[in-house]
Amino acid sequence: MTSSIPASYFVNVQPSVLAAESTGPALNGLLLTNGTRVPIGQVLSFPSASSVATYFGASSSEAAFAAQYFAGVTNASQQPGALLITQYPETGAAAWLRGGSIASLPLTSLQAISGTLNVTVDGYVRSAASVNLSTATSFSAAAAIIQTDLNATLPVIGTSTASSIVTNTATQATISGNILTIPSGSTVTGMFIPGQTITGGTILAGTTITGFGTGTGGIGTYTVSVSQNVSATTITGSGATLTVGGTVTGTWAIGQTVTGGSVAANTQIIGLGTGKGGAGTYFVSVAQTVSSAALSSEATPVAVTYDTVSGAFLITSGVAIGAASSIAFASGTAAAPLMLTQATGAVTSQGAAPATPATFMPAVVAQTSNWATFTTLWEPSISEALAFAAWNSLQNNLFAYLA
C-alpha cells in the first residue's frame, strides 16, 4: 500500500475568529518621485488625492498618480489608507530653502519689506546688506530682487597667480568591447575619469567612462558603459582640467565657481585630481582652454524664485554636484517677514549625490516600513529597474516592486 504525505507537510492551519467589524490592515503604497519638492531624506504620508494635489500642484504628475491610486478598485471593500511619497535623487539634487507661505500677503505689504538677509549656502554666508522690495511689481519680481542682492558680492574662497584650463583629449585611443585603451604613444591633455562622457570617431552616443583599469587619468585602460569596437581615434572627455598653480591661497573645493582670465561663465569645480584644496589639478564642468592666468574660486551663485504652488520664496544652491550642496535657514531683519526662518514655517532640503536602489531603499525602510508596494513615478532604465528588483528580492517577501 502506498503511504500518503500528511497534509500538514504543505499547510498548517491556525484556527481563529475575525472580529465582526474587522477590515484587515491597510496596504499603503510608496511612490518614488524624481521631482524635487519633497525634502531629501523625508517620506511624506498623504491621506487623499486632494492632499497630494495641494502639496505638489493640481497639474503635477504626483497628483495624477494619486488620483488613480486613491480611486482603488471599483466595489472593493477597502480602499488605500495613505500614499507615501519620497524624493529619489536619480541624478543628484541641489540643496534648497523653501519659505513659509506668503501667498495671502498683499503686494503693498510685500513692497514694504526691507532689511538685511543672510543665508549660508554650500558652507558660505551670502549676505544682502539692504534688501528693498519697494519696486517689486509681483512676487516673482521680488524673488529676482532678492537673488540679485544675495549674489551681489560672492565670497572669494581661493586665489592663484598662474592657473590654466585644458580640454580632456587623447589621440590613438581604441575601444574593444567595454575596454577603452589610451596607448603609450598617445598625446594626452587633461585627465580622464569615471563619469565623463567621451566622444570622437565612431564612439556611440552616451558612452561614459565607468571605471579605472590600468589608467589613472592618462595612459592606460578604462571601462566604458557601452560595448563597441572603435579603431584608433582622437577622443574628448566631457568637462576640462584646471591646473591651479603659482601663488595659491585659500581652499579650492568641489562646488566652487572658477573666475578670472577668459574662464567661461558658470564653470564649476566638479571633481578633485591631484589638487586637494591647494595647488594641483581639478575637474571643471565646462570644456574650454584657458592660458595661464590669475584665477580665483568663489561661492557659486544661488537662484531665488517664487514657488506658486506653495506660495513661498525658494532659494536653491547653484552647485552642480549635489553632494557638495547644503543650506541653512535665513537670518537678518528681512528673514522673518519673508518667511524664510524655521519659526515662520520654512523648510530645508540638503544636497544629495545620485541615488542607487541598494543604498536608498534601506534608508527608506529605516524611516518607515508602513507600506507594502512601491514604484517609481518615472520610467526607469532596464538596469535601474533590475537594481530595484534585486534589492526587493532580498527582503523576504516584505514588499512588492511594481516596475
Regions found by a protein language model. Give the residues of each.
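General N-terminal targeting signals
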Residues: 63, 69, 288, 330-332
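Catalytic cores of large soluble enzymes that bind and process phosphate-bearing ligands
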Residues: 41-44, 57-58, 134, 138, ...
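Extracellular Cys-Trp
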Residues: 80-89, 303-307, 317-403
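Extended, beta-strand-rich, solvent-exposed assembly scaffolds of outer structural proteins
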Residues: 48-57, 109-330, 387-393
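Glutamate identity and glutamate-enriched acidic tracts
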Residues: 21, 62, 87-90, 111, ...
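Extended assembly-interface regions of large multimeric machines
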Residues: 1-120, 139-164, 300-314
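Bacterial flagellar/type III secretion structural subunits and associated motility module proteins
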Residues: 94-126, 140-148, 152, 328-367
